[in-house]
Amino acid sequence: MDAFENPFRPGAGTPPPALVGRDELIEKYEVALRRAVAGRPGKSIMPIGLRGVGKTVLLNRFHEIARRHELKVILIEAPETGGFKRLLATRLRSILLELDRGPVSVAVKRALGILKSFTCTLPDGTSIALHVDAIAGQADSGILSEDTADLLTAVGEAARDRNSGLLIALDEMQYLDAEELAALIRAIHRTVQLNLPVVLVGAGLPQLPGLAGNAKSYAERLFDFPQIGSLGSADARAVLTLPTAARGVAFTEDALDELVGITRGYPYFLQEWGYHVWNAASDSPITLQDIRIAAPDVQQQLDENFFLVRIDRLTPAERKYLLAMAELGPGPHRSGDIAAKLAVKVESAAP
């Protein structure tokens, strides 16, 4: 069929043609957002899950919803190599300059001064261009947790003064170091205590709840950590059929069953298989034969890109561990079983 009309979009954080199976979480987020703007903030949301399940797509949807409600939004991908403080300051500068338009606001001017103080303590000794004076004694202690709390409190007050709010959408949150994570949690805790319209949504890998709990013991009371995983059979079928039906293309039932079985409802695989099967098919309906024709291309694409990129980053010990898991078959697996496969003690099995 016409490759130009192919509705499927495999990629990193690429919005799928049909965002299916996440309605409950999106609704929960929108309620939390509206409550925060109304001065009744509650728990912030941190979706967690493996790569390819759609966490970044959800963050982008949350971004869209916040904009629709006329909130200010900063979208950050946490850097692996540090520099989060500068990145946060740069994004908040843009927000405050937006809020500074129109009638003079004491709260906004104060927030700009506190941001100036915050940037004066950047690790490399540089600052971000702001045509205001720093406010002494605010966000200038050099203690990241206190300074970040001062800054987000001031920005929250500035947003409230403009009848707005702030959404911080933070992707790859597990890359924050312990000090950065503790500082951010501390800052959100303070804005909640002061009923300020500040909401944090942070997506990360499954280890994020443990990292957050280690950083601040009250993290589990401040955030919800919904698990984002594979889709059920009905939702997986909808991911395939909704965008194709919009183009007048159908699947045979056995083809749908085959694709749902092959992908196990894993969102990225649904997009990858859907993309290649569409290109392999000559006309509607898409059949089992089309899937068989597309299979080598899908396997090559996954092997050379999806899997290889991750495998290349593994240490030799991690590769051995991964190979042992693969030899055990579909998981999950207990650490004791993996240790037995590696012929080592449980306490020394983990890479």
Question: How should these model regions be labeled?
Answer:
Residues 160-170, 174-183, 187-217:
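Sensor-1/coupling segment of RecA-like P-loop NTPase cores
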Residues 265, 271-346:
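Winged-helix-like regulatory helical subdomains adjacent to P-loop NTPase cores
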Residues 179, 342-351:
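Short amphipathic alpha-helical interaction segments
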Residues 46, 52, 79-83, 175, ...:
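Conserved nucleotide-binding/hydrolysis micro-motifs of P-loop NTPases
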Residues 89-93, 112, 116-119, 156, ...:
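Short, amphipathic alpha-helical segments that act as regulatory/interfacial helices
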